């Protein structure tokens, strides 16, 4: 199974922490090019449910499905739906969940997908084929909403300046290509030699917003909590601070005892649903970064499910919501 050339970021470390065993049932929540899936299937007798919302990734995995002799089920869906996907396959509990969140190298390298400011293509950015594109958001969102999106999801301190320029320019010519938007941001955000590309944060913000990536991640983590068996493992690789903060806070909350107090003994305590396997995030070594610069920002966190019930789901957030912005546009 391991003959494919694709090697995922922190692939060895992810599989070491997942620790797949013979006969176990696992979920690769973000199939992509199938790197984690191949490593899991290398363990004899494993059963794997792999998920991806990108139809191109699903098509690319057809050969692996055929070679797996019934051990791999590949499903086109959002990874936030992993509990429902498992239930549809007759699986109510699994031994491990691994997820590599964010945009994939394959998606970035395809100009037609519109993810990259370095390649000219349609301003799309959708991981799936449904919903508004980045061009739709840029065309319809108010200046205030655009500024919030770019600031909160891209951590761009010049967000208001960028939003103002977008709204001014779109009245003359709609933004339909990645190059047009990247050029505008490049004129508005000044950079020095050695800085990241001026459009990096704006493109990140629009991509996260269009795909609802932070909401997806939060929901996927709680879904994994529900389907993991006691002793089952959750492994998450993230690529920027917003994602890592969500994973870190989720695991910190789920790995501590909460709710009770010696002053209020009648308040029931919530037992930890996870035990941390990584007190600090695992990062890529120098050799991996040299071969794959994208690995520089990767952080891996892992935890093991306890026998305690899943915690109450709290989905509150302060992020701009796609449905709200597009409804008001």
From Swiss-Prot:
Coiled coil: none annotated. The keyword Transmembrane does not apply. S-adenosyl-L-methionine binds at residues 34-36, 52, 79, 100, 107. Pfam families: Methyltransf_5. Its EC number is 2.1.1.199. One of its GO terms (molecular function) is rRNA (cytosine-N4-)-methyltransferase activity. Keywords: Cytoplasm, Methyltransferase, rRNA processing, S-adenosyl-L-methionine, Transferase. InterPro entries: RsmH (IPR002903), SAM-dep_MeTrfase_MraW_recog (IPR023397), SAM-dependent_MTases_sf (IPR029063). Its main location: cytoplasm. Specifically methylates the N4 position of cytidine in position 1402 (C1402) of 16S rRNA. This is Ribosomal RNA small subunit methyltransferase H. It comes from Bradyrhizobium diazoefficiens (strain JCM 10833 / BCRC 13528 / IAM 13628 / NBRC 14792 / USDA 110). The gene is rsmH.
